[in-house]
């Protein structure tokens, strides 16, 4: 072609040439670009070890094996290219996959992958180099990030400042959740307007009552403050179960769906999980930041299991440690790093279950003033080994006590709330395996050498409950005689206590049954959080009953009793639709309810005093749940509590007056008028007494006499 041809001549010539008649197939074949091997098939990997040239083939082999776990790397030298400089690798490489989808999977699953202690791989698209490396695509100048203004949620424990000291409860009915103050016989007082659509599944308070949680398909939402404002959103798709550490520092969530990183980069930038969480289902959240602290995959034996054991993560009393159970091992983590204790598992062959002591344990030979962290676990019998229950001290992992058991079918561990005692309920069988019975093994954890007291029984114990702040306990048992007809009342309620002296001191380590009630249908024990009073209930599909007992009844107590206990049935109430019951934190009231989650019979709730007197019977269609709001531990020290007990009569009169005002409007007006007149009289006296008295005047002594009339007298025993 003539280089001096003008543009006009060139265009004229182009029109004359018929390109359709020309065959370009040989050129197209020679210079064809395979669309399957575009830039989307490549990833660039940073953070790889810098190795000498002689060791580069070995490093490439290791990395290729890793990347083949998420896709298929192209064979040959084209699959992985690792640049060299000065006889060693430069710390990054290029990987070519067969499809863009494989490259995307590598980014999602291996970005942030820890190769060893010093190297973490950073995997990105090769096209991102062009995107972010081109001039003008990324700002060079630094701009201060925009920090949103601080938003106060108010005092999160404001309900504790209620002048009347009332407890709150949440009522869940239909699609609505409301929070109310308990007003005894009167209708509950709304704290907030009941909210429709508040939760998709259920609502739950945190252990100390600071937060209320709602569960949704997108995750979990926390609420708190005076008006239950939105606090934090925890994104976990299709979450089903939630649990909390004792001090509310952490929350655990579980979903049947594995975590999957979004494909869209914008969505991924705000997604709370990284590539290391891909495929995991169990999440531990930091409550203060709202960010995931650690995620876990489910153990293989739990995948696809319909009835999931819960909780899967168990906590020490102060949130310092948490533990998970796996096949033949316990994984114990230290917070807040959530790294394995000593970087290794605690090997326990065939471990079935474990429990943390719910309080610091003061071992007799320990020099730790704050107390020790103790957990218990048990392992079953095998062909050459007996069943075993053990106590382990953490973090030393030292096993401080074990007992061997034989002919064991099951064990349940019941720690006392103060961490001083552990009862292991051992279900045993005869050699023929046709008959079952129970033994109770009591570990006296704070005594020297941790003695173990055995209580052998003929019945099968299916319910055991310690009394709070006491060594007494209750069992419900049934004789295994082959007749399992549930309509026959064969259950026995047994009340136990240690032997004591005349001054109330424990004189024997043996437990004595001081009361038995036979031929009952009862199957549930629910102690007052303050002790002494207990509800023994029957919860079944066909019938329901609550029996209120006083376990320290003084009037009919035998003079020569060797135990600190005397049982009196205060009242029995039928409640055929009952599905659940719970004490309020003060130990003054009991709520029992019939949930529409179980059936549609008499849905609603009933409120009782601790003596069994029914205060309220409220039928509510589609009623689901009654939830008392927990309280944190009292701030009063021993001296403060002693002062309260000393002035209990004075406080009792004030409470009776407040109750009278609340119960009757006329009484309220009379009491307020009396207070007003008394205040006017005191003001008048103060005004004229200031003028003083004249000289030589007869000095008069004013005697003020106030008479009190007792309208009603009620006696309450405060432990």
Swiss-Prot record:
Annotated WD repeat ranges: 194-233, 234-295, 305-343, 346-388, 456-501, 517-559, 573-618
Q: Which GO terms describe its molecular function?
A: identical protein binding; RNA binding; translation initiation factor activity; translation initiation factor binding
Q: Which SUPFAM superfamilies match?
A: RNA-binding domain, RBD (SSF54928), Tricorn protease domain 2 (SSF69322)
Q: Where is this region: Sufficient for interaction with PIC8?
A: 1-228
Q: Which InterPro entries match?
A: EIF3B, eIF3B_RRM, Nucleotide-bd_a/b_plait_sf, RBD_domain_sf, RRM_dom, TIF_beta_prop-like, WD40/YVTN_repeat-like_dom_sf
What main location does UniProt list? cytoplasm
What is this protein for, i.e. what is its function? RNA-binding component of the eukaryotic translation initiation factor 3 (eIF-3) complex, which is involved in protein synthesis of a specialized repertoire of mRNAs and, together with other initiation factors, stimulates binding of mRNA and methionyl-tRNAi to the 40S ribosome. The eIF-3 complex specifically targets and initiates translation of a subset of mRNAs involved in cell proliferation.
Name-wise, this protein is Eukaryotic translation initiation factor 3 subunit B
The organism is Debaryomyces hansenii (strain ATCC 36239 / CBS 767 / BCRC 21394 / JCM 1990 / NBRC 0083 / IGC 2968)
Q: Which gene encodes it?
A: PRT1
């Amino acid at each position: 072609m003539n280089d001096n041809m003008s543009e006009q001549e060139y265009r004229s010539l182009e029109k004359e040439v018929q390109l359709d008649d020309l065959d370009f197939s040989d050129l197209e074949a020679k210079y064809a670009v395979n669309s399957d091997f575009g830039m989307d098939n490549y990833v660039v990997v940073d953070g790889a070890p810098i190795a000498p040239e002689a060791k580069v083939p070995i490093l490439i082999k290791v990395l290729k094996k890793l990347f083949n776990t998420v896709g298929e790397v192209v064979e040959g030298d084209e699959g992985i290219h690792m640049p060299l400089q000065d006889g060693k690798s430069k710390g990054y490489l290029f990987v070519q996959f067969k499809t863009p989808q494989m490259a995307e999977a590598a980014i999602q699953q291996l970005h942030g992958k820890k190769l060893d202690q010093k190297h973490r791989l950073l995997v990105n698209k090769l096209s991102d180099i062009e995107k972010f490396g081109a001039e003008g695509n990324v700002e060079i100048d630094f701009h201060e990030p925009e920090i949103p203004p601080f938003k106060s949620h108010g005092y999160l424990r404001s309900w504790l400042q209620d002048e009347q000291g009332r407890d709150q409860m949440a009522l869940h009915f239909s699609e609505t959740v409301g929070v109310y103050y308990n007003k005894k016989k009167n209708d509950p007082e709304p704290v907030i307007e009941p909210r429709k659509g508040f939760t998709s599944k259920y609502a739950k308070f945190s252990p100390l009552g600071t937060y209320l949680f709602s569960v949704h398909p997108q995750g979990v939402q926390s609420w708190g403050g005076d008006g239950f404002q939105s606090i934090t959103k925890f994104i976990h798709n299709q979450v089903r179960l939630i649990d909390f550490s004792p001090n509310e520092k952490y929350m655990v969530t579980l979903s049947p769906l594995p975590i999957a990183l979004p494909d869209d980069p914008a969505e991924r930038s705000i997604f709370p999980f990284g590539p290391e969480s891909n495929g995991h289902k169990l999440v531990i959240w930091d409550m203060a930041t709202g960010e995931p602290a650690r995620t876990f995959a489910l153990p293989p034996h739990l995948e696809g299991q319909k009835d999931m054991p819960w909780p899967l993560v168990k906590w020490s009393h102060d949130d310092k440690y948490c533990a998970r159970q796996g096949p033949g091992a316990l994984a114990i983590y230290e917070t807040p790093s959530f790294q394995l204790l000593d970087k290794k598992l605690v090997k326990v062959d065939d471990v079935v279950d474990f429990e943390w002591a719910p309080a610091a344990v003061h071992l007799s030979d320990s020099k730790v003033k704050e107390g020790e962290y103790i957990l218990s676990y048990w392992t079953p019998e095998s062909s050459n080994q007996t069943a075993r229950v053990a106590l382990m001290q953490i973090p030393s992992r030292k096993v401080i006590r074990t007992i061997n058991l034989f002919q064991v079918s099951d064990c349940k561990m019941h720690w006392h709330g103060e961490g001083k005692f552990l009862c292991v309920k051992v279900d045993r069988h005869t050699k023929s395996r046709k008959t079952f019975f129970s033994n109770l093994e009591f570990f006296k954890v704070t005594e020297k050498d941790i003695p173990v007291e055995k209580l052998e029984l003929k019945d099968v114990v299916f319910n055991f409950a310690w009394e709070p702040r006491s060594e007494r306990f209750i069992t419900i048992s049934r004789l295994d005689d082959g007749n399992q007809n549930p309509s026959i009342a064969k259950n026995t309620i047994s009340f136990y206590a240690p032997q004591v002296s005349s001054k109330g001191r424990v004189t024997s380590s043996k437990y004595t049954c001081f009361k038995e009630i036979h031929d009952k249908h009862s199957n549930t024990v629910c102690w007052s959080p303050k002790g002494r009073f207990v509800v023994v209930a029957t919860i079944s599909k066909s019938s329901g009953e609550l029996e209120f007992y006083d376990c320290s009844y003084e009037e009919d107590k035998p003079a020569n009793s060797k135990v600190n206990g005397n049982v009196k049935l205060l009242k029995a109430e039928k409640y055929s639709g009952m599905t659940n019951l719970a004490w309020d934190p003060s130990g003054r009231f009991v709520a029992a309810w019939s949930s529409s989650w179980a059936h549609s019979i008499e849905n609603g709730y009933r409120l009782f005093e601790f003596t069994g007197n029914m205060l309220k019977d409220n039928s509510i269609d589609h009623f689901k749940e009654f939830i008392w709001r927990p309280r944190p531990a009292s701030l009063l020290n021993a001296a403060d509590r002693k002062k309260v007990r000393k002035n209990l009569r004075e406080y009792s009169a004030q409470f009776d007056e407040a109750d009278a005002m609340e119960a009757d409007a006329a009484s309220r007006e009379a009491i307020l008028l009396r207070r007003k007149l008394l205040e006017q009289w005191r003001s008048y006296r103060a005004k004229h007494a200031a003028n003083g008295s004249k000289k030589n005047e007869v000095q008069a002594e004013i005697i003020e006499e106030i008479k009190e009339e007792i309208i009603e007298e009620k006696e309450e025993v405060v432990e």
